[in-house]
């Protein structure tokens, strides 16, 4: 059965696409058809508008990712296609320029956002959105930022912000966009005024469905959410709502997602109880048997840890198993990929198996003897069913029977360990 929220979101996306298509059909033919390629019908990244910003009265649009060959007269001529332009301003940069277009009426500006966002100008998709002063948006430079990955292509700043606004101190949300394609890079950042809210958001939102995908949440690397402030023609500082490129976040150093990148071998473990130690986490993942563990770290004050495996498939299996296993200290842990790949050439140094968990009244030697005794008991019962007419040839060769082996365990000795192991493998 389809998720009602997902169904409702899909209906909204379809309605938005229909509105955009109608706007395109109504608009006048554009200038320079050889320079400006037809648009791609994609959801408009409406963004998380700042408090105090009223788009119903806005007549100005921001234009980002402009090709360096574009001139200011050409920019104004193109945007005149949606309505009369009052003024325009182009700010040149080395890699790509940006600018602002001021219309006489809001309808022309809204139509420009609907019809021109994503259009390719000299082979480069431009981004068009409402323009507003930076002062209207809260300064989040000192806030606590989290990384949100595996975002669906249709998720915008506004969608992301709405999903995390259930946490009272959520202050901002931004989806990162690829300047070359004009599409979402599949991840973004959410800011919080309160550190505890940020941690709670990581714990509670990791693995939750947002649109058509399960998102993953983690702490963001310092400086990963920085964006470039822009200056408008009247000197007011303005920032683009959907800022984002491969240079905006350290998480984008590798173009591939962790799921498809063999260099990612570390598992992020969230929602840990305060009393969980490094040894506890090691025991938990060792018991899963997903693979060879090479490193275990725990940040007890922040409630998360990391488990590094020898290979990528082992880490992937650990994530899958960790999210479906019983609780650890009465909490359901949440596993996802770590945000950094294992550096190439890292030496393999497997950790030794962790010491068994203490049981009241029993020593480690007692537990080891008990495990051996249990294995022999199972071996004897299976052997009795399979070889009722005679002894197993290996048992005959070594002179062992079930009762004798069990007695040897109680006497504290076990001279035929190798023989018993052979019996366990060959029965």
UniProtKB/Swiss-Prot annotation:
It is found in: Nucleus. Residues 1-23, 223-261 are annotated as: Disordered. Residues 59-133, 144-222, 265-340 form the RRM domain. Its main location: nucleus. It comes from the Eukaryota. Residues 9-23 have a biased composition (Low complexity). It holds the Pfam family RRM_1. The modification Phosphoserine is found at residue 246. Keywords: mRNA processing, Nucleus, Phosphoprotein, Repeat, RNA-binding. GO terms for molecular function: mRNA binding. Heterogeneous nuclear ribonucleoprotein (hnRNP)-like protein that acts as a component of the pre-mRNA processing machinery. Functions at multiple steps to facilitate the nuclear maturation of plant pre-mRNAs. PANTHER family: POLYADENYLATE-BINDING PROTEIN RBP47B, TRNA SELENOCYSTEINE 1-ASSOCIATED PROTEIN 1-RELATED-RELATED. Interacts with UBA1A and UBA2A. This is Oligouridylate-binding protein 1C. It comes from Arabidopsis thaliana (Mouse-ear cress). The lineage of its organism: Eukaryota, Viridiplantae, Streptophyta, Embryophyta, Tracheophyta.
